[in-house]
Amino acid sequence: MSHHYVVTAQKPTAVVACLTGNFTSPTDLNLIIARNNQVEIDLVTPEGLRPLKEININGTIAVMRHFRPPDSNKDLLFILTRRYNVMILEARMVNDVITVVTKANGNVSDSVGIPSEGGVIAAIDPKARVIGMCLYQGLFTIIPMDKDASELKATNLRMDELNVYDVEFLHGCLNPTVIVIHKDSDGRHVKSHEINLRDKEFMKIAWKQDNVETEATMLIPVPSPIGGVIVIGRESIVYHDGSNYHAVAPLTFRQSTINCYARVSSNGLRYLLGNMDGQLYMLFLGTAETSKGVTVKDIKVEQLGEISIPECITYLDNGFLYIGARHGDSQLVRLNSEAIDGSYVVPVENFTNLAPILDIAVVDLDRQGQGQIITCSGSFKDGSLRIIRIGIGIQEHACIDLPGIKGMWSLKVGVDESPYENTLVLAFVGHTRILTLSGEEVEETEIPGFASDLQTFLCSNVDYDQLIQVTSDSVRLVSSATKALVAEWRPTGDRTIGVVSCNTTQILVASACDIFYIVIEDGSLREQSRRTLAYEVACLDITPLDETQKKSDLVAVGLWTDISAVILSLPDLETIYTEKLSGEIIPRSILMTTFEGIHYLLCALGDGSMYYFIMDQTTGQLTDKKKVTLGTQPTTLRTFRSLSTTNVFACSDRPTVIYSSNHKLVFSNVNLKEVNHMCSLNAQAYPDSLALANKNAVILGTIDEIQKLHIRTVPLGEGPRRIAYQESSQTFAVSTLRIDVHGRGGAKPLRNSASTQAQNITCSSNFLPKPGGGNSTAANAEVGQEIDVHNLLVIDQNTFEVLHAHQFVAPETISSLMSAKLGDDPNTYYVVATSLVIPEEPEPKVGRIIIFHYHENKLTQVAETKVDGTCYALVEFNGKVLAGIGSFVRLYEWTNEKELRMECNIQNMIAALFLKAKGDFILVGDLMRSITLLQHKQMEGIFVEIARDCEPKWMRAVEILDDDTFLGSETNGNLFVCQKDSAATTDEERQLLPELARFHLGDTVNVFRHGSLVMQNVGERTTPINGCVLYGTCNGAIGIVTQIPQDFYDFLHGLEERLKKIIKSVGKIEHTYYRNFQINSKVEPSEGFIDGDLIESFLDLSRDKMRDAVQGLELTLNGERKSADVEDVIKIVEDLTRMH
């Protein structure tokens, strides 16, 4: 049996619907946004959008509409899911908390209906009498509205129109009247139907208009008293009300398809239109008073400016509108009354959207065991790379350019009673600089008692309103009030101070092997004891373990030569415990600290690794030794307080915050490239902040409370499709699609983008034959015709600058990409597969595999081989090129002559779209035949089919979990796991890949990659997870699939079953129903997968509900079976959350 845990690390970001209404109260103006299975409710305020609530739906949202019942003063929400579940939602205030309740729900599916080719469409009558839906061909589904009904019951009305593109209800009609755009053999037509709600049937055709524009796809109903409908086509706009007809054909419309609209004015005279080019238009209806009332006399359209490619638009208020997008970032924009640089559109805020994620690369650029995800996100002009890593963010408030800092401390100087620090001391080689913080101003100053001509080793406020400065020469005690030197201690002889540590009452100084213990008194420094150790001191610490005490009874010392940590007692400096640190790397920083009442000793080494121990406060004994790798450079440990808890900041090339959760240490990366020095700063202008120094500057900022995903955008201006990483050249290769327009002088890019602005640009020689006489190539394109131009971009791994762009001549397209080391060749190559896509051909007949070498800022084509058809997938396979070409899987070897020679192939697929390899085994994902496992017999030079999944599935991605277990995703948003049965007794059983686990994710996975978002092997983990596979989806979600053992699965499954009963979903769709594995009419229960999103919701429950959820649960702890209590389960679930 195969057991897996699947959880979302990044929720879906693509917006599928948005609307504005009075949902939470009659006076609240709400923006409501739907993303896949989530609804976000925001409040529109003068300051901007304020999130109020986020709700999860156990279903994939297909349509979201709002309406206002006749007897209500606020709006209700109607949602239709992909599985035809319907619900009406209402917001209510319960104990001053907004609660979304399900007023009515139901399922409107039909077991014999043929799904509509135009997709799922729904509309609501303006008087809220009926909801109408086009779900199946030839049927119009209605739900009559009954305010007292809790169940939504549907009736199907027979409809002559089969191919329906849009449906709306007309305003101002006595009976509900629906209008449709449909298509038949004669063209596209608009027709209206009046509905008899009592008999639940169509009464008559109110009016119709035959032969509208052949590409008309959208209807806009016009409110009363004007009435009628606006028909939006590719080239024209028509207004029609049955008798009155007006049309306009704006020239700019021909460039792209209008796909969404928003009504601006309640009288229905102004509408915003958005198209697939990301252009925003305003449509004006001109009216006139006649004997029949107000009628439309003309239509005007004005182009306003550029926006993200919209999926939906809603007008908020006062010239603000929200652009919901699924190809790029969603936006809040403002419309200006005057044009600025030809545009009336002013972007106000962008909302990150990763969708659609077509490919991902998981890289560990810093070699820290922590994955950084680079996604190919977005489409067309909104395409980008997104750099995603998990960590703790620093919110930067100020930056001071100061290179060469060797140490940094914050002080409170002067007699001011203010609790705030006002001084920053910066140490440099050979001198010290002092900065005064006055508000947000930073000025250089002096403290007369400090030795400014020497490098400071340590600085601190100490008892009796005094300051300490330690240099290589001496320890200086300075009055905070007068800033004058009041006492000084110097080491005897010609010794110089090398290492120092202090608290508010004690100082510990080391010079080579000698240690001096000094007590701070009022106006004096008293040396109390000294001792010579066997080896030279590398680092030391005198921090009190008890936070309520000012002085410490213990000293921690790190020694050279024998590489050890030594605990000394005070005041006599006697050795009470010695811990040998294995290896030859010296300790560079040592720290005693207390987390959640447990005392620890942390000891960081010169190679970026760190040992940590539990420490006995009385005996100094160190136990429970553990080691983690935090960076690659020497690490300095400093404490700071955040939210009244102690934390440790590890300064290095990979800065890390160390804290404790449930009595376990947690190590979280900080999203800064490098931090050499750090100190707490609580200044008036920068309260509860940190000062962080790198080699060039000081950053003043605040630290996030929790670790989370941090996303950086690299805009490309064209659509990225595939990505590969090459460590040897420190570059990424990205294949992109750019849209050019054919003009009189040839093809021209529509806009500047990554491929047009690269440092170097080359163009492919189009050696390929031109089928059909070449009449489809770019050279013979018509003026104004759009041309797909594919590019290979080489991008620097650190700066993400486009170093080289290689353009392929249309109609040659890039279908696959990888980086590979081939044969005995010392070079690493980029391997690119292309195909010739001719519109007149059902599928490409010819393509090529090209070998590129990037070296010394030059991209050189080394070799190429012609292939028959499209190469959908490339994989490096034991130093060879494995390719899925049409229905073949082929293996090419790299010869000494730098040529690709086909070694073997196998043909038993419809289309080999996806390939993964491990050892001699190859996993093939087929277009519609699920997955097949092949083995390469090296001695015979052949492929052999080992086993296959005989259940047909339209595949989207595959991955090898281990030698016998294989993960797949298919087009209906399902995940499944098949397992090879090596112990099978018959050949027939051995040739099958039985499906052992299945799960409905509710989103289509496009790519799987092995890797982790968090640092591996860091800290203590109680959850027995094995391996980690990341996935990216169409809707911009990133998730994790990991394997778990049987007993842990049983425990989590028990918790999952209890949570299903305790957590009531909005919309009343059962969790079990939602996660059912469904392909067309075939439905199977979810099995072998644990829903991590549901498990993690345990942490959001009240304590009473937590107790209910764990009642009767048993778990195994330290080899013993016991009844689970709330604390046990909290620890386990929190541990699971640390995967992301």
From Swiss-Prot:
Designated name of the protein: DNA damage-binding protein 1
**Family annotation (InterPro entries):** Beta-prop_RSE1/DDB1/CPSF1_1st, Cleavage/polyA-sp_fac_asu_C, RSE1/DDB1/CFT1/CPSF1, WD40/YVTN_repeat-like_dom_sf, WD40_repeat_dom_sf
UniProt GO MF annotations: DNA binding
One Pfam match, by short name?
A: Beta-prop_RSE1_2nd
Q: Which organism is it from?
A: Drosophila melanogaster (Fruit fly)
Known role: Protein, which is both involved in DNA repair and protein ubiquitination, as part of the UV-DDB complex and DCX (DDB1-CUL4-X-box) complexes, respectively. Core component of the UV-DDB complex (UV-damaged DNA-binding protein complex), a complex that recognizes UV-induced DNA damage and recruit proteins of the nucleotide excision repair pathway (the NER pathway) to initiate DNA repair. The UV-DDB complex preferentially binds to cyclobutane pyrimidine dimers (CPD), 6-4 photoproducts (6-4 PP), apurinic sites and short mismatches.
Which pathway, per its entry? Protein modification; protein ubiquitination
Q: Where in the cell is it found?
A: Cytoplasm; Nucleus
Its primary localisation, in coarse terms, equals: cytoplasm
Disrupted gene: resulting phenotype?
A: Reduced tissue growth in the wing imaginal disk.
Instruction: Describe, as the record does, how this protein assembles with itself and its partners.
Output: Component of the UV-DDB complex which includes DDB1 and DDB2; the heterodimer dimerizes to give rise to a heterotetramer when bound to damaged DNA. The UV-DDB complex interacts with monoubiquitinated histone H2A and binds to XPC via the DDB2 subunit. Component of numerous DCX (DDB1-CUL4-X-box) E3 ubiquitin-protein ligase complexes which consist of a core of DDB1, CUL4A or CUL4B and RBX1. DDB1 may recruit specific substrate targeting subunits to the DCX complex.
- What is any one of the record's Gene Ontology cellular component terms? cytoplasm
